[in-house]
Amino acid sequence: MPSNDNKWGIVYCPKSGAFRPQRKWEKVEKCLKDKNIDYDFVQSETSGSVERLVKMMINNGYKIIVVVGGDSALNEAVNCFMQTPKEMRDDISLGVIPNGLMNDFAHFWDMEDNDIEQAVETIAKHRVRKIDLGCIKYTNEKGEKCHRHFLNCISIGLVASVIQKRRKAQGAFLSKLSFIPSSLLMIFQRLEYKMRIKIDTDVIDRKVMTVCVGNAQGYGFTPSAVPYNGLLDVSVVYHPEVVQLVEGFYLLFSGKILNHRSVHPYRTQEIIVEKAERAQISVDGRLMNTPTGPFKIIVQQEVINFIIP
């Protein structure tokens, strides 16, 4: 296998709906050259190509792999990492330059969306921390046993639909604004889902509006979660009254959602969802095909080398 120990392998993921998406790469490229970074890069052409490109980088011996993208691109990268033998994976580190419609995992580490210099300097310093991943284990419609890892969160129910609406907004500016009107639809849709969930010794068997299982901040629904304690935070949201729902928006955007009376927080290593009728599921901000039958969500401790500020 060829060796590229010190050279960065960069996967550039253009932001969906952005005006002149290549402008961001031009800025990244200038910063890399100004700091004399040795790198190779490839550009992702489709939403599903990141995994293939990261695998190519790993097979070509790169030890520092950088994703210029958002949560979904990072999700594809870590799922590729987890298909790599542990002894090989332990020698590779993952960095990010935020460039997605949603960059929640980068925000957890106080990385700014448009501060390219900060991100490049962070990767150049190469301060690495082993982080946890969440993992959903399920059966697909063909009866096959499947799994998918996540960095940030899994959302089940209405919030999964809201996140998807936000992703569909055209342009970065509209995307940031779209979460508010999409969320306001909750008031009028009044959607609930019949769920049966086991969290340690607790059993929740009732109608639920949304469940968020967070390895990190979970778009505000698991604000106390951290990806290095071997635990998942779970927020189960029952259906509030309209006045309480408006209050909930304020608490969500101020990072205090756990103070809301309709939000029931848990911390665990495993959650079993025995039933979630009609509920959509999103993994790191992207909808997945709904599992057939029960599914399990677990945490896998210290499995990825992530470059942090």
Which residues does each PLM region occupy?
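Catalytic core of DAGKc-family lipid kinases
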Residues: P2, K35, Q83-M209
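Short glycine/serine/threonine-rich phosphate/pyrophosphate-binding segments
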Residues: V50, A73-A77, I131
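A generic structural signal for short beta-strands and their flanking turns/coil linkers
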Residues: L191-Y193, K207-M209, Y228-L232, R267-Q269
